[in-house]
């Protein structure tokens, strides 16, 4: 059966029953039909139980198809519950654009999925819509201000705030707005990005309360004035209205796995130009309600795990207790250009980063495919053992929670035996430039960093505005540990080039652009939209 057929055949429990497993009452949730709910934020204040343990699922450098982080995340939480450990997953909401583009649906796979799959992949509870409208309200107010006399003196050539839509549409990357005379606004160049790339999305995921959300929105930089002054959303006095649009979106969403175990799905920031993790609030809520929370970070350990630790955990006051590195034979052979042994060097770098840079206990999860041979599995296991890394053959795609029992046992053992004290990778008091250099040299293995001339002006602004104590959000290719997608495996002898710096002051970080990162994807020649359908009974097919 396909993933969607497996999901549709699942026996789902009413969301009230899932909430009860977490100790929640009907008054604690707002139901969106029978199988979805939002959880009220006061649950965090009312619940006094100690926090559970936080498990991060990351991966080796992925192939375009992905290596199954979400599947392993869901399978691991199913396995923990099967062992009698109260556990929940905390993951991101998929973006509509990739659903209709190349990727198709995204809610795990096989017998390690989250349901209702169709709802999660389409409109879900409306959070993406709310984030898009909130973002575009700012856009509308910027152009209205310019058309109404431009009292702030906004330099229309230096507006950095784009518009958003939750769709892959390359035709919107570069546009001209305000055509047709003065009644239609001031003509200028503009562009769209996909909604998950919005700073509003990052802010929603990094806010601990409505009050903090509003303050972060107020601090968003949308451009500069003709005199070089930073223009912020607070200058338009609209932060209250923008936050009001997000009053429901800020509440975490509760759903379930195929095995009726709880899952929080909330937020979905881009793993490149943002931090690529689900919301702080959903993670904190899961930690407060369960003994073990399994979460994931976008792309590989060089990108997602670093930002999870240095951005999400730092801003949310979170402490991970263990990391799982997902590896596949397919991806390792890809990095070795067909040679599995050579490709293991990629895994080696990620193990080193997790153990020695992030200082976390770890387990390598080999996400098993039916084409994998015993010889290949044995080679990976031997490699991990030689490096002092626990390893587990993970079969959650085929067997659900049962296929993740060994992984769950080894994760619990790693947590119980951990003697190291968690700390962030870099000192927040380093300058932005020093943080970038530390990440590039130590996490990526670069010989050095080249800063393009365009970055000098931004560094000057960072210094003048006192922004050096913000964390750094690295934006680079996910296809390589380096900034060059062609360098596979464990690259050496390279330098990272930082082409540009972007100020995400509202979210609370500075984005370092290494290479050309597209924030508005396009559809492939044959998009997934061509195979998605709905019958007369409302049954959807082709999502995955």
Curated annotation (Swiss-Prot):
Pfam family, one: FTHFS
EC number: 6.3.4.3
GO terms, molecular function: ATP binding; formate-tetrahydrofolate ligase activity
Keywords: ATP-binding, Ligase, Nucleotide-binding, One-carbon metabolism
Enzyme class: ligase
UniProt: ATP binding residues: 63-70
NCBIfam families: PRK13505.1
HAMAP family membership: FTHFS
Family: Belongs to the formate--tetrahydrofolate ligase family.
Name by which UniProt lists this protein: Formate--tetrahydrofolate ligase
Organism: Fusobacterium nucleatum subsp. nucleatum (strain ATCC 25586 / DSM 15643 / BCRC 10681 / CIP 101130 / JCM 8532 / KCTC 2640 / LMG 13131 / VPI 4355)
Lineage: Bacteria, Fusobacteriati, Fusobacteriota, Fusobacteriia, Fusobacteriales
């Amino acid at each position: 059966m396909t993933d969607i057929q497996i999901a549709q055949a699942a026996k789902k429990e009413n969301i009230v029953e899932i909430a009860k497993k977490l100790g929640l009452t009907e008054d604690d949730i707002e139901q969106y039909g029978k199988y979805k709910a939002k959880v009220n934020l006061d649950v965090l204040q009312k619940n006094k139980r100690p926090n559970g343990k936080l498990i991060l699922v990351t991966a080796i450098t992925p192939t375009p198809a992905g290596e199954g982080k979400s599947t392993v995340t869901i399978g691991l939480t199913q396995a923990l519950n099967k062992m009698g450990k109260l556990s929940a997953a905390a993951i991101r909401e998929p973006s509509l654009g990739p659903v209709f583009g190349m990727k198709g649906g995204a809610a795990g796979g096989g017998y390690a999925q989250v349901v209702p799959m169709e709802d999660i992949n389409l409109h879900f509870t409306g959070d993406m819509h709310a984030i898009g409208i909130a973002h575009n309200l700012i856009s509308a107010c910027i152009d209205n201000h310019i058309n109404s006399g431009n009292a702030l003196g906004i330099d229309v050539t230096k507006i950095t705030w784009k518009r958003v839509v939750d769709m892959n549409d390359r035709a919107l990357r570069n546009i001209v707005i305000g055509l047709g005379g003065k009644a239609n606004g001031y003509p200028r160049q503009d562009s769209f990005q996909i909604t998950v790339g919005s700073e509003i999305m990052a802010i929603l995921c990094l806010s601990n309360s409505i009050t903090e959300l509003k303050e972060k929105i107020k601090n968003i930089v949308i451009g500069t004035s003709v005199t070089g002054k930073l223009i912020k959303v607070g200058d338009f006095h609209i932060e209250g209205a923008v936050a009001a649009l997000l009053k429901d979106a800020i509440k975490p969403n509760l759903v379930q796995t195929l095995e009726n175990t709880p899952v929080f799905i909330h937020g979905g920031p881009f793993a490149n130009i943002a931090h690529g993790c689900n919301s702080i609030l959903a993670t904190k809520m899961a930690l407060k309600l369960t003994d073990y929370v399994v979460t994931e970070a976008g792309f590989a350990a060089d990108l997602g795990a670093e930002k999870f630790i240095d951005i999400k955990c730092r801003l949310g006051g979170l402490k991970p207790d263990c990391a799982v590195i997902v590896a596949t034979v397919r991806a390792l052979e890809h990095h070795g250009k067909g040679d599995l042994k050579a490709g293991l060097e990629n895994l080696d770098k990620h193990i080193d980063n997790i153990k020695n840079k992030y200082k976390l206990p770890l387990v390598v999860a080999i996400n098993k495919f039916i084409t994998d041979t015993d010889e290949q599995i044995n080679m990976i296991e031997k490699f991990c053992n030689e490096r002092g890394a626990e390893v587990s053959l993970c079969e959650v795609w085929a067997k659900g929670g049962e296929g993740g029992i060994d992984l769950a046992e080894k994760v619990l053992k790693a947590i119980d035996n951990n003697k190291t004290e968690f700390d962030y990778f870099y000192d927040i008091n380093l300058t932005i430039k020093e943080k970038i250099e530390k990440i590039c040299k130590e996490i990526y293995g670069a010989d050095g960093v080249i800063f393009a001339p365009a970055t000098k002006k931004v560094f000057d602004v960072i210094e003048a505005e006192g922004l050096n104590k913000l964390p750094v959000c690295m934006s680079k290719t996910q296809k390589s540990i380096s900034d060059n997608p062609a360098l596979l495996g464990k690259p050496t002898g390279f330098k990272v080039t930082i082409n540009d710096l972007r100020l995400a002051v509202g979210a609370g970080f500075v984005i370092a652009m290494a290479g050309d990162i597209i924030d508005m994807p396009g559809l492939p020649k044959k998009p997934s939209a061509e195979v998605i359908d709905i019958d007369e009974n409302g049954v959807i097919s082709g999502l995955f």
